[in-house]
């Protein structure tokens, strides 16, 4: 008998993957957590029925969250990741030698625990000496921080459950306060096919707080529609004006210095969402 997992991305559309076996399933304090082994994408982390990451395509999301803001900032030393308990963004952040400390605040400790167990190629960097892992509410951590971080990355689930507060204007204002005077922030902002209103709202809210606000995209096969967006807000540095000398060689599978600029070239229907 074949086993298949289907993520219903809308009421009428979804994606499905053949499952070899279930590695772990649990109702945590915050969400339903499933770790499964798939035929096509390797081990897959699922939260509340939504694919969070897979061994096969994880590098796209994690590289684009991390390297776009880190190469935009001239000297990022202190970095905060809100969410991201699978450890993929941390792994990419640590490729930048200027980063002296990376703090990860994940609300659900079970995500960290089982990512370490079943996604070691993604979560292995969580034990690095430059990393501080805190199990707690990222919203509250931001509220308690001021003029502390060079770059803040919000690696959250979609705006449901424990992540709902991470898509509010008040949260973005708190991020601005937590950043230093030339700080940069980035957040995943879902896809333009099924959630265009979210992109419009988030971009508008961020633009009212950050003088430089831009949208960029990446292609991620296991995320709804495959076309994913990220909103970046900066107090001083424009991601489209990064000097050539700032790029240094790091090992990546998706991100390149050419792609850095190309990612901001939006299809017209996506650009229309943020006019």
Swiss-Prot record:
Pfam families: Spermine_synt_N, Spermine_synth
Record EC number: 2.5.1.16
Associated pathway: Amine and polyamine biosynthesis; spermidine biosynthesis; spermidine from putrescine: step 1/1
Keyword annotations of the record: Cytoplasm, Polyamine biosynthesis, Spermidine biosynthesis, Transferase
Residues engaged in binding S-methyl-5'-thioadenosine: 31, 106, 137-138, 162
UniProt KW Iron-sulfur keyword: no
InterPro entries: PABS, PABS_CS, SAM-dependent_MTases_sf, Spermi_synthase, Spermidine_synt_N, Spermidine_synt_N_sf
Residues covered by the PABS domain: 2-235
GO terms of biological process kind: spermidine biosynthetic process
Record field: catalytic activity: S-adenosyl 3-(methylsulfanyl)propylamine + putrescine = S-methyl-5'-thioadenosine + spermidine + H(+)
Chief localisation class: cytoplasm
SUPFAM superfamilies to which the protein is assigned, alphabetical: S-adenosyl-L-methionine-dependent methyltransferases (SSF53335)
An example Gene Ontology CC term for this record: cytosol
Active site per UniProt: 155 (proton acceptor)
Taxonomy, superkingdom: Bacteria
Molecular-function annotations in GO: spermidine synthase activity
Record bears the keyword tRNA-binding: no
Subcellular location field: Cytoplasm
NCBIfam families: MFS_SpdSyn (NF037959), PRK00811.1 (NF002010), speE (TIGR00417)
UniProt function note: Catalyzes the irreversible transfer of a propylamine group from the amino donor S-adenosylmethioninamine (decarboxy-AdoMet) to putrescine (1,4-diaminobutane) to yield spermidine.
Family (UniProt): Belongs to the spermidine/spermine synthase family.
Protein name per its UniProtKB record: Polyamine aminopropyltransferase 1
Gene this protein is translated from: speE1
């Amino acid at each position: 008998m074949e086993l298949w997992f289907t993520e219903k991305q809308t009421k009428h559309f979804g994606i499905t993957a053949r499952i070899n076996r279930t590695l772990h399933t649990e109702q945590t304090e915050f969400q339903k957590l499933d770790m499964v082994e798939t035929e096509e994408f390797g081990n897959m982390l699922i939260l509340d029925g939504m694919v969070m990451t897979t061994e096969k395509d994880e590098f796209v999301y994690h590289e684009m969250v991390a390297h776009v803001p880190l190469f935009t900032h001239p000297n990022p030393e202190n970095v905060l990741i809100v969410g991201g308990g699978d450890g993929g963004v941390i792994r990419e952040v640590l490729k930048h030698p200027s980063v002296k400390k990376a703090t990860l605040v994940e609300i659900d400790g079970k995500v960290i625990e089982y990512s370490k167990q079943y996604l070691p190629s993604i979560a292995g960097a969580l034990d690095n000496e430059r990393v501080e892992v805190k199990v707690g509410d990222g919203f509250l951590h931001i509220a308690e921080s001021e003029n502390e971080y060079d770059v803040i990355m919000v690696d959250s689930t979609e705006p449901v459950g424990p992540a709902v507060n991470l898509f509010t204007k008040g949260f973005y204002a708190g991020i601005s306060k937590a950043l230093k005077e030339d700080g940069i922030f980035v957040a995943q902002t879902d896809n333009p096919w099924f959630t265009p209103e979210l992109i419009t709202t988030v971009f508008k809210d961020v633009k009212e707080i950050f003088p430089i606000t831009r949208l960029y995209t990446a292609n991620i096969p296991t995320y709804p529609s495959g076309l994913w967006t990220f909103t970046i807000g900066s107090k001083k540095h424009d991601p489209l004006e990064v000097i050539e000398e700032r790029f240094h060689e790091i090992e990546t599978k998706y991100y390149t210095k050419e792609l850095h600029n190309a990612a901001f070239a939006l299809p017209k229907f996506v650009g229309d969402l943020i006019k």
